């Protein structure tokens, strides 16, 4: 018994339909795919290209740190969006603008642009984030300064349209100025989170979900996979406990941080704690960064972009400063009481305990690496990692608590020793300091990320910015949630340079504007009513992926287009067809045609000189035709309301119409009718006239008494024309009918065996006798030869002329021969009497 088909099986055919490439979203990771670092993603849809971020990998040097820009033509990029100023998201932007064929526009928020200028300039001076002195920088400081004016700054919650691409930035909560971007291309909404945080901290606004917008594709980070953060209060308490314990044992605390971002949050925490605990105020807190002073100025400038806590603190301190008569207004939320800025280590008196926040956060080079190599040999000191550590960096390595670390900034310091093996370049330093980690990285954890994805409710999720094992765990978790959903969420985690294509089919809706919008739509029609809704025609205009239907006269107002009317004319001459025949042919094809009022001559007698055959030889009529120099209009018709047909006395027909797609097709059809009006059988029959001739014709058709040989000759001619002269030959041996009464041979079963056998010579004689009788029989009925043999290549067929049976071992060839023979019989019939 047949089983019932499932709905999924019935919809399989529709799902397998080919997809138009223009309806596919192409996503390509040039960096940040199954890794953290050098984030760079490409989005292509409907011929538009958006590039997301342009970072460098902190663990690599030179060109190896760049995204795989050679795998994509950057000249096709329309818009480049930078989510925030961190090295792994923005550091290769000067290279893109100065060293590639990129011709698009670059956007970032105002705080990001302000910080980006100083951050990249400092990174170039330090060595372009390279710990290898032999590596050449990928761009210079001058490249950065020259390309900086190309960057355009935008505000949160403002929508901008560039090349039909709509972008809207939203707060991301990661660092000051960090943005999530809503990108709309042809009605497809793509939401890119960048690095984002949903945690309420001391100075940043947490990430928000766009309200009232249906997101089709969500591109989100997966830095921590499904791991969960310790609650914020517990982390702060544990951090301060570790710092105070190191200070109490007489050590120094090194906290490697990015120059901007989490460092400011940690400074707020430390300054608040020091203010509440006077016994620790004797230990100085340093913020060591070349950008320290400039960074604080930027943070003081963009207080309005921070959360309510900072704004409240700013108002309180400004009020206190005003009450105390401080006209300079010093006392804002970023004017710390217990923290000192340290531009470089030359002014640092390394005596006694202290807390040092130093950049860069990955400990690859710079002040943080120099202090690590200086303080690592002492067990009193401690290193506290507060941010995310990228694979391959010293920050990631030291978390494994190795016994030794490689010296980069201080190769000749005391206590260092060279590696065995004679490698003079690598110098090792013993590590005895403590190492602890407390995450203040401002990235969402697994729970927050999953809740955010569920809140967005996008049918397609693309995971980026995460190590492979973390990303795969998050992907598996998201896919497991599909079990309880009717609409399954598609989750992708592409690798670098792995092209991802996702089909998106959307209904195309046109907005009716102008005069056409005044037409009332048809009311609901009951099944018993047969009213036909009115037909609306207009011009369909596409602008920025939006379709509008309007009347041609509204193009200037609603589309900004000027219209031009093109009048087309075509002339042809008919030698035999007159106006009556032309009108009859047009009416037969197009129905009723309209007669134009410009006709100058009466309809009677306007048959045209070419329509009537000159049979009387009247010299006077011939003279009138010869004297007529200017052809006058005989008739004028309007076909299908758009094509004018004018017939003149000299047989010239002129077609005139307004050029457009519909009218051009009708005009082509009219010309096809006119070109065939003189030769079509219907037209010939229409214009024919009855007549009689007095010729003396023989009463008997000369072909009536053709002999069988003549008919055979005609048949052979026809077959030779089809198959070739050498491939057709008569068959002289007839096809014998089956023997009757075959049992007569066995009527004397009791006779001797020798009597039952027939001599071989006797059989041949009997066969020849039967063949001769068959040939005589065929001759009597008028068949000269039994059959015809036809050979083409390795195929052969025999046609028996009595019943026109075709014998061949090739069925297709036999069918072909049978069709040709039947046609030959029709031509030469009757063959045989």
UniProtKB/Swiss-Prot annotation:
Its EC number is 3.1.27.-. Residues 600-624, 685-707, 728-767 are annotated as: Disordered. Zn(2+) 1 binds at residues 84, 86, 174, 195. It holds the Pfam family Lactamase_B_6. The active site is at 443 (proton donor). One of its GO terms (cellular component) is mRNA cleavage and polyadenylation specificity factor complex. GO terms for molecular function: 5'-3' RNA exonuclease activity; metal ion binding; RNA binding; RNA endonuclease activity. Residues 694-707, 744-759 have a biased composition (Basic and acidic residues). GO terms for biological process: mRNA processing; secondary metabolite biosynthetic process. It comes from the Eukaryota. SMART domains: Beta-Casp, CPSF73-100_C, Lactamase_B. InterPro entries: Beta_Casp, CPSF73-100_C, MBL, Metallo-B-lactamas, RibonucZ/Hydroxyglut_hydro, RMMBL. The keyword Metal-binding applies. This is Endoribonuclease YSH1. It comes from Gibberella zeae (strain ATCC MYA-4620 / CBS 123657 / FGSC 9075 / NRRL 31084 / PH-1). The lineage of its organism: Eukaryota, Fungi, Dikarya, Ascomycota, Pezizomycotina.
């Amino acid at each position: 018994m047949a089983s019932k088909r499932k709905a999924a099986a019935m919809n399989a055919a529709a799902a397998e339909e080919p997809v138009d490439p223009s309806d596919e979203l192409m996503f390509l990771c040039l960096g940040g795919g199954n890794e953290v670092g050098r984030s760079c993603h490409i989005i292509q849809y409907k011929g538009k290209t958006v590039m997301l971020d342009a970072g460098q990998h902190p663990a690599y040097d030179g060109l190896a740190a760049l995204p795989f820009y050679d795998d994509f033509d950057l000249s096709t990029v329309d818009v480049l969006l930078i989510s925030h100023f961190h090295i792994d998201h923005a550091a290769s932007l000067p290279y893109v603008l100065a060293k590639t064929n990129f011709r698009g526009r670059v956007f970032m928020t105002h705080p990001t642009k302000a910080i980006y200028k100083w951050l990249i300039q400092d990174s170039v001076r330090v060595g372009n984030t390279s710990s290898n002195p032999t590596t050449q920088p990928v761009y210079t400081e001058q490249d950065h300064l020259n390309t900086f004016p190309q960057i355009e700054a935008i505000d949160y919650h403002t929508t901008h349209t560039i090349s039909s691409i709509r972008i809207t930035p939203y707060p991301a909560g990661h660092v000051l100025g960090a943005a999530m971007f809503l990108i709309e291309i042809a009605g497809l909404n793509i939401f890119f989170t960048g690095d984002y945080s949903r945690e309420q901290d001391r100075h940043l606004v947490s990430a928000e979900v766009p309200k009232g917008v249906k997101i089709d594709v969500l591109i989100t980070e997966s830095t921590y996979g499904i791991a969960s953060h310790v609650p914020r209060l517990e982390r702060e308490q544990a951090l301060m406990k570790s710092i105070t314990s190191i200070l109490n044992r007489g050590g120094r605390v090194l906290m490697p941080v990015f120059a901007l971002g989490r460092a400011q949050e940690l400074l707020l925490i430390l300054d608040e704690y020091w203010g509440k605990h006077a016994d620790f105020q004797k230990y100085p807190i340093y913020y060591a960064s070349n950008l320290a002073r400039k960074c604080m100025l930027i943070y003081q400038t963009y207080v309005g972009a921070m959360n309510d806590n900072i704004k409240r603190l700013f108002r309180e301190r400004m009020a206190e400063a005003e009450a105390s008569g401080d006209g300079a207004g010093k006392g804002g939320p970023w004017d710390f009481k217990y923290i000192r800025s340290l531009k470089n280590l030359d002014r640092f008196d390394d005596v006694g305990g202290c807390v040092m926040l130093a950049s860069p956060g990955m400990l690859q080079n710079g002040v943080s690496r120099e202090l690590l190599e200086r303080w690592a040999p002492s067990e009193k000191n401690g290193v506290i990692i507060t941010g995310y550590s990228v694979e391959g960096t010293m920050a990631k390595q030291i978390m494994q608590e190795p016994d030794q670390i490689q010296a980069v900034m201080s190769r000749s310091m005391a206590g260092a020793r060279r590696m065995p093996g004679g490698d003079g370049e690598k110098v090792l330093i013993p590590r005895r300091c403590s190492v602890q980690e407390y995450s203040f990285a401002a990235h969402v954890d697994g729970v927050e990320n999953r809740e955010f994805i569920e809140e967005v409710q996008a049918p397609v999720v693309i995971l980026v910015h995460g190590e492979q094992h973390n990303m795969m765990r998050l992907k598996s978790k998201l896919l497991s949630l599909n079990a309880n959903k009717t609409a399954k969420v598609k989750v992708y985690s592409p690798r670098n340079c792995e092209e991802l294509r996702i089909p998106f089919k959307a209904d195309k809706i046109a907005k009716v504007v102008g005069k056409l919008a005044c037409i009332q739509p048809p009311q609901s029609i009951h099944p018993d009513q047969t009213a036909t809704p009115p037909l609306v025609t207009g011009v369909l205009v596409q602008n920025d992926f939006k379709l509008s239907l309007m009347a041609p006269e509204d193009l200037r107002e609603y589309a900004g287009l000027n219209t031009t009317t093109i009048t087309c004319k075509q002339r042809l001459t008919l030698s035999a067809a007159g106006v009556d025949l032309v009108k009859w042919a047009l009416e037969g094809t197009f129905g009723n045609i309209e007669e134009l009022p410009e006709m100058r001559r009466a309809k009677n007698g306007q048959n045209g000189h070419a329509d009537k055959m000159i049979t009387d030889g009247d010299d006077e009529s011939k003279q009138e035709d010869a004297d007529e120099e200017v052809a006058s209009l005989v008739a004028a018709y309007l076909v299908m309301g758009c094509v004018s047909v004018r017939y003149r006395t000299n047989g010239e027909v002129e077609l005139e119409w307004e050029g457009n797609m519909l009218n051009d097709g009708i005009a082509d059809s009219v010309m096809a009718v006119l070109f065939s009006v003189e030769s079509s059988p219907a037209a010939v029959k229409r214009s024919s006239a009855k007549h009689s001739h007095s010729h003396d014709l023989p009463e008997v058709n000369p072909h009536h008494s053709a002999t069988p040989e003549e008919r055979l000759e005609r048949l052979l001619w026809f077959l030779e024309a089809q198959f070739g002269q050498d491939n057709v030959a008569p068959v002289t041996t007839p096809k014998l009918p089956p023997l009757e009464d075959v049992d007569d041979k066995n009527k004397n079963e009791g006779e001797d065996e020798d009597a039952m056998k027939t001599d071989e010579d006797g059989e041949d004689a009997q066969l020849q006798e039967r063949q001769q009788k068959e040939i005589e029989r065929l001759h009597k009925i008028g068949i000269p030869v039994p059959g015809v043999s036809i050979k083409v290549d390795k195929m052969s067929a025999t046609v028996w002329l009595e019943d026109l049976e075709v014998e061949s071992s090739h069925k297709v060839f036999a069918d072909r021969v049978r069709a040709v023979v039947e046609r030959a019989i029709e031509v030469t019939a009757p063959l045989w009497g």
